[in-house]
């Protein structure tokens, strides 16, 4: 817990330094489909805060993600290898005291997934771009998303992404940090295992940020593997959101 809720900036920074379990949800809408498809992507990982020359730095490492889709019987998912290939840049965070509570802002630092190049430039839309990479090492360009529709159909799409997210968090009295994520990422479908799947798909975040929460919970520094995190997931985080299916 944050002892005597830090009233000055330096003590607030020191209070935040540590190793955290990371949970976030991003709610997306894809209007390129016949009926709007909504998706929750729930990400798990570790966030570390440390001081460097008086600056409070944030480092993130993602280990596992779940995808929930509003369309009945449609499932999709990224392998843990693909999730672990997402490498946000270490970045300074800003702290401000608002109404007696410390607010933290992590600004967007674009990073590329499935393609190399300049992350500050728009994502390439060339399916034969020579800079395509295979970070999940499955022999296909970009990262692979597996898709299934009931028992009738399954396939894969191969995507690249330019991850662009920022966090707005509040330091709570119990030492947790909670808030929401703003995601302006870009996605490009490089190819697919079946022609029907090779369609543009670029979901945008749902405008209600309440559907895209972030929760960081301080944990012991020796808990640092995906297996250890997922073992204690239920004791740290809320239940994953679900879509109501008729």
Question: What label would you give each PLM region?
Answer:
Residues 3-9, 151-246:
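Edge beta-strand at a domain terminus
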Residues 40-172:
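Predominantly extracellular/secreted and cell-surface proteins with exposed
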């Amino acid at each position: 817990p944050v002892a005597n809720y830090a009233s000055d900036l330096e003590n607030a920074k020191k209070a935040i330094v540590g190793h955290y379990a990371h949970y976030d949800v991003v709610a997306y809408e894809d209007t390129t489909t016949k009926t709007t498809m909504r998706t929750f992507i729930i990400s798990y990982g570790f966030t570390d805060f440390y001081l460097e020359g008086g600056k409070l730095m944030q480092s993130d490492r993602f280990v596992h993600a779940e995808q929930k889709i509003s369309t009945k019987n449609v499932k999709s998912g990224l392998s843990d290898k693909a999730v672990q290939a997402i490498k946000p840049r270490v970045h300074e965070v800003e702290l401000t005291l608002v109404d007696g509570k410390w607010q933290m802002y992590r600004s967007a630092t674009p990073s590329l997934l499935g393609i190399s190049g300049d992350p500050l430039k728009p994502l390439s839309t060339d399916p034969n771009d020579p800079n395509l990479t295979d970070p999940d090492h499955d022999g296909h360009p970009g990262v692979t998303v597996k898709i299934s529709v009931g028992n009738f159909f399954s396939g894969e799409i191969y995507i690249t992404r330019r991850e662009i997210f920022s966090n707005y968090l509040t330091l709570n009295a119990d030492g947790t940090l909670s808030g929401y994520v703003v995601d302006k990422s870009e996605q490009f479908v490089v190819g697919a295992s079946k022609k029907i799947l090779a369609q543009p798909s670029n979901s945008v975040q749902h405008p209600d940020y309440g559907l895209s929460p972030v929760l960081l919970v301080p944990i012991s520094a020796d808990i640092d593997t995906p297996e250890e995190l997922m073992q204690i997931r239920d004791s740290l985080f809320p239940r994953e959101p679900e879509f109501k299916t008729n």
